[in-house]
Regions:
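N-terminal low-complexity, intrinsically disordered "leader/linker" segments enriched in small/polar
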Residues: 2-53
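Primarily extracytoplasmic/secreted proteins
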Residues: 51-251
Length: 251
C-alpha cells in the first residue's frame, strides 16, 4: 500500500499484511517483538503474519527396535503451505534411503549421507515437504525394504509462513552457514550422526541429543534468527561424523 503521511492505523497494516482480529502491532513487527519506544519502521513489519516462524519441533521416532518399517507422530498444528523438515537416521540395515512419507506426502530429499564405523552402518537423510492439508500432527512413515534396520531416529521441524530453502553447508568436521536474513528472519536447522558419543555439536545454543544404537550418537538442533544478517555455525567431531545445516527464509 502507499504509505500515508499521517494517521497510520493497524487497520492499514492489516490490509497490507493480513492476519486475524483482534490485531496488535506485535503480530506484525519483527517476529512478534514490538519496541516499547523509539522509531517503528515499515521495513520491520515482518512478524507472525508476514514472516516465517518455527511452529513446532521434536522427536517423531526414537527406537532401537529391529524392523523394516517404522512410524511415529509429533503433535503440531499443521496448516496448508507449512514446510515440514525432518532429519532421519538409521542404524545397521543397509545404505539405502528407504521410502519416507511425511503426512502421507513423499518429500524432497535435501541430503543423503552414508555412515560406517565397524560394525555399524546406516545413513542420515534430510527431507522436506510442503503441507497440502491441515493436520493436528506431523506423521512420519518409513519403509526400509527387506533389510532390517536396528533402530530409527527422526527429528522434525514445522516452519510456518511460506518458507523456502535458502542455503546449505556440509562438512565432515565443521559446517558454517551464513544467512542474510533481511527483515524477515531465518530458521536454521541441523543434525549430526557420529560414532563419538562425547562430541555434542552446538547450533547457537539450541541442542537436542540422544544416544542411538551401540554408541552411535544423534544430534538435532536449530536456531531462529531475526532482523539482521547472522552467521550460524555447527561443529562436530572429526571422527566418523556426518553433519548438515540448512537455512529457511521467507519465500
Amino acid at each position: 500500500m502507499p504509505v500515508p503521511t499521517t494517521n497510520v492505523g493497524l487497520s492499514d497494516i492489516a490490509a497490507e499484511f493480513g492476519g486475524t482480529v483482534p490485531h496488535a502491532l506485535s503480530e506484525y513487527y519483527n517476529n512478534g517483538s514490538a519496541p516499547a519506544s523509539g522509531t517503528i519502521r515499515f521495513s520491520h513489519l515482518a512478524g507472525e503474519s508476514a514472516g516465517i516462524s518455527l511452529k513446532a519441533y521434536g522427536k517423531v521416532i526414537d527406537t532401537n527396535t529391529n524392523s523394516t518399517s517404522y512410524s511415529g507422530s509429533l503433535s503440531a498444528s499443521v496448516a496448508v503451505g507449512d514446510v515440514i523438515v525432518i532429519a532421519k537416521v538409521t542404524g545397521f540395515g543397509d545404505f539405502a534411503q528407504g521410502t519416507t512419507t511425511i503426512n502421507s506426502i513423499s518429500g524432497t530429499v535435501l541430503s543423503f549421507d552414508n555412515e560406517w564405523f565397524s560394525p555399524i552402518y546406516g545413513m542420515m537423510l534430510f527431507e522436506k515437504v510442503t503441507a497440502t492439508a491441515s493436520a493436528s500432527s506431523i506423521s512420519v512413515s518409513c519403509s526400509e525394504g527387506s533389510s532390517n534396520r536396528q533402530g530409527m531416529y527422526v527429528f522434525a521441524w514445522l516452519i510456518g509462513g511460506g518458507a523456502t530453502h535458502d542455503d546449505t553447508a556440509a562438512s565432515a568436521s565443521t559446517g558454517t552457514l551464513t544467512v542474510d536474513t533481511g527483515e524477515n528472519g531465518a530458521i536454521v536447522v541441523g543434525g549430526s550422526y557420529t560414532d563419538d558419543s562425547y562430541a555434542i555439536p552446538d547450533l547457537n545454543g539450541a541442542d537436542f541429543e540422544t544416544t542411538f544404537n551401540r554408541d552411535m550418537h544423534v544430534w538435532a538442533g536449530h536456531t531462529v534468527q531475526s532482523g539482521t544478517a547472522a552467521t550460524s555455525s555447527m561443529t562436530v567431531a572429526t571422527t566418523g561424523s556426518d553433519n548438515r545445516i540448512w537455512s529457511f527464509i521467507k519465500a
